[in-house]
C-alpha cells in the first residue's frame, strides 16, 4: 500500500493501493474525489478560497502535483480543476466521481464581528466549485473549532478522520 502525505497547497491522485493523507487541517479544507468504478481518486489540501490571479499550472504528469511558483494549488478553484483534470487523465469520467470534504475549522476567535471566517470561506468556495463542476458531495465533516487529519483509502473510498482540539 502506497501512502502519500499531502501538505497545504498540494494535491495527489492514485489508484486502489494508495492512501492519501492530509495532516493538520485547521481552516484548510481537504477535498477527496473518488471514482468507485475504477477505485481511484485524489485529494487536494486547499488553503484559500479562490485565486483571483491568472496562474499557469505545471502540466507534467507525476504521482504528486505540487504547487507551482505562484502557488495556484492553494486555491479551491484551481486545485479542484487540477484534481478533476488528473482524474480524467487516469480514465475517470466526471459522472462517476463523488466528493467528500473535511476541515474548514475556526481555530482562532474571529476578531472582527460580522466578517466571514477563512474556514467558512474555504468551505463555501469548495462547495461552490464542486457544484459548478457537477460533482456531488456525499460526505463531509466541516466547520467547528477542532483541527482534523484525514486518511483517504482509495481501495474503498473510506476516509478516516482524527480530530484534535
Q: What residue spans do the PLM features occupy?
A:
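Short, basic and Ser/Thr-rich N-terminal targeting/leader segments
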Residues: 7, 14, 25-27, 95, ...
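Conserved mixed alpha/beta catalytic, RNA-binding, or beta-rich assembly cores of soluble enzyme
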Residues: 21-90
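Amphipathic alpha-helical interface surfaces
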Residues: 76-83, 97, 122, 126, ...
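Short glycine-rich phosphate-binding loop at a beta-alpha junction
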Residues: 95-103
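Phosphate/ribose-phosphate-bearing ligand recognition and processing surfaces
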Residues: 106-119
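Divalent-metal-activated hydrolytic enzyme cores
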Residues: 118-165
Amino acid at each position: 500500500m502506497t501512502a502519500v502525505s499531502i501538505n497545504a497547497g498540494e494535491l495527489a491522485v492514485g489508484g486502489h493501493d494508495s492512501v492519501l493523507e492530509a495532516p493538520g487541517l485547521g481552516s484548510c479544507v481537504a477535498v477527496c474525489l473518488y471514482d468507485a468504478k475504477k477505485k481511484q481518486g485524489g485529494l487536494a489540501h486547499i488553503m484559500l478560497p479562490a485565486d483571483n490571479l491568472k496562474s499557469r499550472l505545471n502540466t507534467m504528469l507525476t504521482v504528486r502535483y505540487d504547487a507551482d511558483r505562484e502557488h495556484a494549488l492553494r486555491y479551491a478553484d484551481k486545485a479542484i480543476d487540477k484534481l478533476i483534470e488528473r482524474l480524467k487523465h487516469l480514465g475517470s469520467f466526471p459522472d462517476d466521481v463523488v466528493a467528500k470534504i473535511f476541515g474548514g475549522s475556526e481555530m482562532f476567535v474571529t476578531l472582527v464581528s460580522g466578517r466571514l471566517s477563512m474556514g467558512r470561506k474555504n468551505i463555501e468556495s469548495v462547495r461552490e466549485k464542486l457544484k459548478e463542476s457537477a460533482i456531488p458531495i456525499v460526505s463531509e465533516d466541516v466547520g467547528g473549532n477542532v483541527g482534523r487529519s484525514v486518511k483517504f483509502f482509495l481501495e474503498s473510498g473510506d476516509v478516516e478522520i482524527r480530530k484534535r482540539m
